[in-house]
Amino acid sequence: MSFKTTKWTILTLLLASFLLVSTAAFAGTPKETSEEAPEYVELVFSDWHLAEPHWEKALKEAFVIFEREHPNIKIKLDVVSYGEKETKYTTEIEAGVGPDVFHLHAYSIKSFIEKGYVYDMTPFVKAEGPGFTDAWYSQTIELMKKDGKYFAMPGDFMAMVLYYNKNLYREAGLDPARPPKTWDEFLEYAKKLTRDRDGDGKIDTWGFGTIGAIDPGFELRFTPILFSHGGSYLSKDNKCSALNTSEAMEAMKFFNDLVTVHKVVPPGVTAQNPGTVRQQMANEQIAMLLGSGWTPPIVDNNNPDLNALDVLEAAAVPVKAGTSPKFSTTAWLSAWMISPNTKHPEEAWELVKFITSKSMEEKWFKDARVLSSRKDVSGEYDELLSDKFAKIIAAELDHAKFVPQLKEWPQIIEAINTAAQESFTGAKSPKRALEDAHDRINGILSVYRTSSDKCPGF
């Protein structure tokens, strides 16, 4: 074989080898691409419960399950305080950012819907098929809607009840099996429970703890007192304040007198929020408070030595003596929403659906003792129905009424919260403070009145 022939043979073989390798490499490209890890979607989840250790643990456990079931979704946690959540979400949503999924007290729903701060979930709800929403109590589902569209999904649903420390009852000579049924009895109990327990000559335990700070939690503590006195916040058509009624004035005076006249509430009430009042209960500085399913586990977490799950008892909210009002307490309802700014609405819906599923709602009760807006949980879950606190709360739902569902409600309740604070501090008399709140609320509601509509004076 000549040198020339050999050279061409070698070149031919090299070229063939190159083409073979190149073809194999190119042929392998689709396979390699298909094996690449899928792109992750990150959802920002925001909830005030993340600031509560027992809830934080429960939520993190749940998200491990969710991420395992949805490997293309990762959850990023965004902590917010209960008192700051509305301000935070409003500011962020207005700026075009904010969490993908967030949690609110139901009284903010109307305001957030009106302002366009929530994503329309209707297509997702309808895609779940007929009967999907039948698992929830109808009144809770209705509050999530506007004009037939769904803008949120219900979460916790509970009545406010009276919690008390049975050991402090016994020390004061009271029978824990006989909680007060009327506000007169309640005051009598509170006076006996307000005493010096350590013998230093100074009061160190008070009968009752409540909220006096300007705080969203005020509504849940004052409303049972108002309703159980037969009062209302607004007229039946929601066009005028109803604080000028004798029932409302009596309720506000009673609330104020607990602090300023009878002194059965610890000093410094105007600085107290839900968290600090629960801490007072954990420290045995107070013997009674108004709360709901969240109260025992939080108090227990604040002071495990108290053994709150055993020491605390629950009872119906007292009523005005000689009356039997149809509604004697208020209902707490929370809502899960999707931000209108989310870039991943389908994935956000999957998270909301997961959070509000039957299995997760059972977990929330098991871990945080909150009742559910799902009938197949609050009405059927054996562990809930046998719990000493939950069965009282569930029974009181028949006597619980929601506050008026208006977008102006946050402004309205703040006016009443301010009136309570003014009367506590002595800046105004209870009557004057309530009158000013009455006038302020009528001003807020003027948008709903025509020139012929007149509101009664105070």
Model features per residue range: what roles?
Residues 139, 143, 312-317, 365-418, ...:
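Long, aromatic- and glycine/proline-rich binding clefts that accommodate carbohydrate-like moieties
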Residues 83-120, 132-152, 162-163, 168, ...:
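Pocket-flanking alpha-helical
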Residues 187-192, 237-269, 313, 317-320:
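Glycine-centered hinge/linker elements that transmit conformational signals in sensory
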Residues 160-164, 226, 336-338:
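Short glycine- and hydrophobic/aromatic-rich loop-to-beta-strand nucleating segment
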